[in-house]
Amino acid sequence: MMITGKFPSLRLRRNRKTDWSRRLIEENNLTPNDFILPIFLIDGKNKKQSIKSMPGVYRYTIDKLNNIVDRAIKKGIPMIALFPYTEKRKKNDLGTEALNENNLVCRALQRIKNKYKNEIGIMCDVALDPYTSHGHDGLLQNKYVLNDETIKILLDQSLLQAQMGCDVLAPSDMMDGRIGEIRKYLDKHNFKMTQILSYAVKYASSFYGPFRDAVGSKNLLKGSKKNYQMDYRNSDEALREVALDIKEGADMVMVKPGLPYLDIIKKVKENFKIPVMAYQVSGEYSLLEHGIKNDLTDRNIILESLISFKRAGANAIVSYYADRLDQIIK
């Protein structure tokens, strides 16, 4: 029950009068434990390649990973997420590079796990879009992504990543039923403790543009993803997606994008009491950076946007600002 008062005996501004008082009663704050750091991978050696559409974010070759992971551990970030930039010559209609044990993600997993063991968690994307020549998350037939046939490939992709050392598999493909099938497949092969972070609520969004640039699929996408990703006009459907994935064995769920869907984060958290992650996606990041660079706003907007995820109920945030938290909170 909310206890109310009446002006002038009640003045809510009293608690806002000083900095120490505001800090004393703050309801939400950020620590490094609240973040997952995305890392983009690229083939080659000794490369740190800028991404034009995402200022301040880079693609790295595997030999550069130690410095990044060292810094993440030092800053107290619990988990990193690996995303590959796949060369066009390695892409095909079936996305077979996803099953290559020498692909970028597998080599990165082995390098990080061999050196760092369990000092930091590693999350890997389970989907075919970085590897397909058409840019879709699954097998394409007559402009339609096949569901059950795609899942068969995702099973092998999931198992391969688990074998290489992935801690948290994150299916982002939005195929119906894939969480249950992946869970059973992992259990069958003695990976019962490998966690699944389901992209249960992934909307067909225009906020993904810079990310597709970062992984090399932007100019390849044929058609839209609206026949498998969620309709941004819907919220009840999001709860159905989460409910299904929990029943199928998801340990955590993701809402993506983040800032335009704070209402969804709140609904999911209130209804299911499951760990909820939010993805501050590339479009959100680039919009903030553009506004700051062009003096449309100041850098305080970053902290404000990140706090909003926590206020809505997110347990953690996938953010390109993850390793810059000390610069954001001053």
Predicted segments with their positions:
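Alpha/beta enzyme core
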Residues: 3-10, 18, 27-36, 42-330
